[in-house]
């Protein structure tokens, strides 16, 4: 096949889609490029019927290669290893908008691999990978109701930005990724700095409009080189069997969905499913139990959806706008730095905040460069939270994604580093789940941080919205249950403060939603969020003024850059000695900012005292309590400050010239001395007197900054012929 190229003007960039040259044995392969960032996306799908599957086995693997940026991977093996969290998140970003566009009951295996081959650090590869996946699917011949487009939207000074550069993104108040078909939005993922509902809705509409040129070009590419799609038809529905299941089970299923307790309801539905399968197999043993079970599930879906659309109470008895009952306990765990038990209906999370120092920050080494993450949020979803057994171990894709969403919701309200220099780690343990556990994590995180004494700019709450839509009838649901998520058409999570939205995630399972529905969902989400914030404020209105007694303390000092060497010492000896003597962790950066970290307040104060002594200047006219460090023929060296000595001449020690210094002073002896002067070489002249004499008053209070000589350096100066004479006194 000849190489085919499509060029699209996309914001300030030129997007190039190429096929026919690379990976020609894949069903679909597209090289997507934008200003030096190149991503190869391939699609392969199995042509067998997939009848052995009862789910759609779609796999998306996004991978970044270090050679793309001219780097060699770290580690012993010097090659790329398991996917990073960022790669996992982008894999999910590609998966979410394309999955709903495959036909119902299409169970053939499909694999998409997106590989970053070249990276311009100013151009993020995620949008390029999403567009490349859409193009590769569109030419692969797989049944796919696309294509989709994707775009990133920023917001600065009242203007929306299309696919902003990395520098522009740093100045933007919004980072929104949107994907959809030419007719409808399918997926939104965003982080914002407390923006209004209208601004967020406008960003979604703007991004959707801008991506239509990309969709048009992919359609043209598919017409030119796309493989013919097989005539795929969903298996025919056995209408007789469907009617029989309805007759046998409908009344009992309707009654089961009046049971408000999740576990009791599930137990009853399991019993009814097994009874229905047994009854129908007894009537006709040629029937397939899996087919009966699937039709039973369709009956459940129909009952729940129609009841909601008819205006009847939801599964747990609520109306469409009511949030489930909330209970909150802060200081839930005794020895943690901050903790919260957040319960909303049958969804519950124990959220724990831990404070650390700069050394606890996570170092992330990716192709975009090395970064330090000072705010970590880890979300755990153990199987017991839904009453099941299962494997426990490394976080799955869903856990990584939920943790990332909750983290983005809090980023806008975290204090500045100079105000609160701690590194923060949050762990959310989901102990019960019946929908919206990620939003429970958002609420619990806000409370746990305030419980730990973190001065958040504002509390943050989150709520998950749902949608039931049949034709022109629809209902938007606030604070959805797990069943309403599973049986519904939308999962729309919104988090924010009283002032505005900080994070938003939307996944649509149908062909799309109207602007009216989106506006209704945002309006109800604001109402629900405001209610939840009120409950949270009743439990803990402000952050604790004192840190937990179990939390470490951090003190920050700023010293002149020319003092850094003094504090570190030769080969790091001085700073190591400070750490060993005080037990305090000490970090100093190139700008002279020192961070002291210890659970012991007294140790922190001692370390501060020693550092101040290290960098202190000797002042002429001041009196110091010094220690005799060395005795020589012409006097004694007195240590005034760490690393700073002065000479007490023999004339200031002995009344008689024949008297020896050793007869008056001994090494280690402490005496009070007066700084009489500092010469151009930085040598300090001392007097052994109770108070300054009259002639010293001329310099009283004067401060002289100089390069002070140590005892050894002064001794060398004197021995080399620069001896301080009595006449100089």
UniProtKB/Swiss-Prot annotation:
CDD domains: KH-I_PNPase, RNase_PH_PNPase_1, RNase_PH_PNPase_2, S1_PNPase. The keyword Nucleotidyltransferase applies. Residues 710-729 are annotated as: Disordered. Its EC number is 2.7.7.8. Keywords: Cytoplasm, Magnesium, Metal-binding, Nucleotidyltransferase, RNA-binding, Transferase. Residues 621-689 form the S1 motif domain. Its main location: cytoplasm. Mg(2+) binds at residues 485, 491. Signal peptide: none annotated. One of its GO terms (molecular function) is polyribonucleotide nucleotidyltransferase activity. Its cofactor is Mg(2+). It catalyses: RNA(n+1) + phosphate = RNA(n) + a ribonucleoside 5'-diphosphate. One of its GO terms (biological process) is RNA processing. The keyword Transferase applies. Coiled coil: none annotated. One of its GO terms (cellular component) is cytosol. Belongs to the polyribonucleotide nucleotidyltransferase family. Involved in mRNA degradation. Catalyzes the phosphorolysis of single-stranded polyribonucleotides processively in the 3'- to 5'-direction. This is Polyribonucleotide nucleotidyltransferase. It comes from Legionella pneumophila (strain Paris).
